[in-house]
């Protein structure tokens, strides 16, 4: 099996677990990702959220609109550019944040069970490098360019 296949399997398994567990707090598939990033980055705009999560802007727009309809996030016009909408977590959304963080911490601890601290640090460092390696391709393809393979 390839490294990317393993990363994909891990990501899908953890995402599936989270989606099932977050049904209890009325979060639909993948919405926890957006809620957490907005909570961590108050005032984030759609483009920044798109780049942070490596998803297209239309996906971000649909997801935050659903969170807004549930009263978990709210948008405000940016002071410096009225065309930009800044996103903030509401009081209702803030109440879910600790539960999501607890699930994330549990999943990380369970996933890394049996790894030494040095191994965890090395793995994180390598994964950051992998992400850096793909960022250029992601940005190029997002702008309509084709990769040469």
Give each language-model segment a name.
Residues 117-149:
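C-terminal regulatory/oligomerization modules of transcriptional regulators
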Residues 41-45:
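Short capping segments at the starts of secondary-structure elements
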Residues 1-25, 141:
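N-terminal leader segment of winged-helix/HTH proteins
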Residues 13, 17, 33-36, 95, ...:
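Pre-recognition alpha-helix immediately N-terminal to the DNA-recognition helix
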Residues 8, 36-40, 101:
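Short, locally clustered residues in the helix-turn-helix/winged-helix DNA-binding domain
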Residues 65-128:
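Charged, amphipathic alpha-helical coiled-coil/dimerization segments
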Residues 50:
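The alpha-helix within a helix-turn-helix
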Residues 46-47, 58, 65, 85:
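Residues within helix-turn-helix
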């Amino acid at each position: 099996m390839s490294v990317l296949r393993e990363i994909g399997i891990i990501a899908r398994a953890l995402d599936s677990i989270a989606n099932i567990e977050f049904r209890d707090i009325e979060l639909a598939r993948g919405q926890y990702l957006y809620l957490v990033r907005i909570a961590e980055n108050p005032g984030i705009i759609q483009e920044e959220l798109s780049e942070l999560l490596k998803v297209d802007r239309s996906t971000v727009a649909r997801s935050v609109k659903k969170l807004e309809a549930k009263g978990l996030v709210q948008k405000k016009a940016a002071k410096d550019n009225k065309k930009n909408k800044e996103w903030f977590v509401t009081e209702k959304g803030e109440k879910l944040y600790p539960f999501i963080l607890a699930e994330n911490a549990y999943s990380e601890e369970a996933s890394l069970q049996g790894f030494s601290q040095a191994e965890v640090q090395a793995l994180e460092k390598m994964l950051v490098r992998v992400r850096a390696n793909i960022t250029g391709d992601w940005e190029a393809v997002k702008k309509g360019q084709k990769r040469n393979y």
